[in-house]
Amino acid sequence: MRLPFEKQWLVPDHPPFEPDCFVIPSYALKDHSTPTKPTIAEIELAADWWRRFPHASLIMCTGDNQRLGITNASVMAAYAVRLGVPSANVIEEDQSLNTYENLYYAQKIIQERNFRQPTLVTLDLYTRRAVATARKMGWTDFYWLSAYSRGEPAYGYKWIQTHSRFTLYLYEVLAMVYSKLVGWV
């Protein structure tokens, strides 16, 4: 269920017409082998689009930012493969620890592999910040898709961030303020 004040925060999707890569920043992991519902929603949306464009690659972003001893990217990649995406189409960006780094390292992969139509796939509450960060970094000719999800407690310090739809919203508003203060957006 959407919160009454979400409408002002959400940005409309900008769907691609011929995507060659989907960039999926992790929202969080529940444990060593399970993404949280928001991250699952992102992966499932990307996999749905991959089925329409099977030549495309999925770039799973985020290192071990929860100190689980495994990268979020590897857990996300395994989930995508279970959904039927061939491992040859899944790229693990496992160095990043935050949104800025997700997009920085993803941009390097996009340039190295000569992808032409990158598409961000994010939680709907996260899209505004991810798109603003990408624009500030100089991304051009990119697209975005948003996945809806309820919250679910994540492992460790991300527990409160992902606990509920309300805490996801609150976190994103505060993260946008922080991103403005540090110059990421």
Feature locations, PLM:
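A structural signal for short, hydrophobic/glycine-enriched beta-strand patches
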Residues: 2-163
